[in-house]
Each structure stands twice: as structure tokens, then as C-alpha cells.
Amino acid sequence: MIPGEIIVNKALGEIELNQGYDKYTLSVANIGDRPIQVGSHYHFYEVNEFLSFDREPTLGFRLDIPAGMAVRFEPGQSRTVELVAYSGKRIIQGFDGKVMGKIKE
């Protein structure tokens, strides 16, 4: 098994992950001098300060990639990423400690 792999009955057809959740697409640049890697469930609002982007709209969002995967930003690299909203109780704890509680709607 591959991390993030989903094995389903082929008779079900194609399954879209995170269907119906709010999504947000943005451009992100690594302005630092070292690579930065962001995991699938890391609160994007709280990622490394050397990733340059408008943070406010990313509050309550994570990368829209399979569980266990990550996106790597090389120094000087810009790339477009898609984010997906956290679901459930929408309580953010830990990470960089910038939120520590329920995300306001």
C-alpha cells in the first residue's frame, strides 16, 4: 500500500476526494534559502514564515492532497496549490500555536 492510497471497488466508478468542501487556490513562494515541506494535514495559515502568500484567507484550510503526502517548496520557487477547508468541529490545536481553538465562521 502507498501512503494516502485508497483501494475501492472498481464498480463504484471514480471517487472525488473532499467533494463538497470549500476549496481555495493560491500562489505560494519560498523566499527563504532552504527547502520547505508542508504535510497534508498541516494548517496552512501556520506554515513556515518563509512561505510568502496572503495568509488570512487560508485560516482553516489545509493542502488538498492525499493523507500522508507533502508538498515541497524549493528556495526561490513559486507554485500554485489548492487548499481544502477543515471539517468537523473545526478546532485547530498545536501546529505553530497561532490559532489554538475553534475557527470562527
Swiss-Prot record:
UniProt pathway annotation: Nitrogen metabolism; urea degradation; CO(2) and NH(3) from urea (urease route): step 1/1
Reactions this protein catalyses: urea + 2 H2O + H(+) = hydrogencarbonate + 2 NH4(+)
One term of GO molecular function: urease activity
Coiled-coil zones: none
GO biological process: urea catabolic process
EC number: 3.5.1.5
InterPro entries: Urease_beta-like (IPR002019), Urease_betasu_sf (IPR036461), Urease_subunit (IPR050069)
Broad class of where this protein is predominantly found: cytoplasm
Pfam family, one: Urease_beta
Subcellular localization, as worded in the UniProt entry: Cytoplasm
Keyword Hydrolase listed: yes
Keyword annotations from UniProtKB, A to Z: Cytoplasm, Hydrolase
A cellular-component GO term for this protein: urease complex
NCBIfam families, per database record: PRK13203.1 (NF009682), urease_beta (TIGR00192)
Similarity comment: Belongs to the urease beta subunit family.
Classification via HAMAP family: Urease_beta (MF_01954)
Known partners and oligomeric status: Heterotrimer of UreA (gamma), UreB (beta) and UreC (alpha) subunits. Three heterotrimers associate to form the active enzyme.
Protein name: Urease subunit beta
Gene (name only): ureB
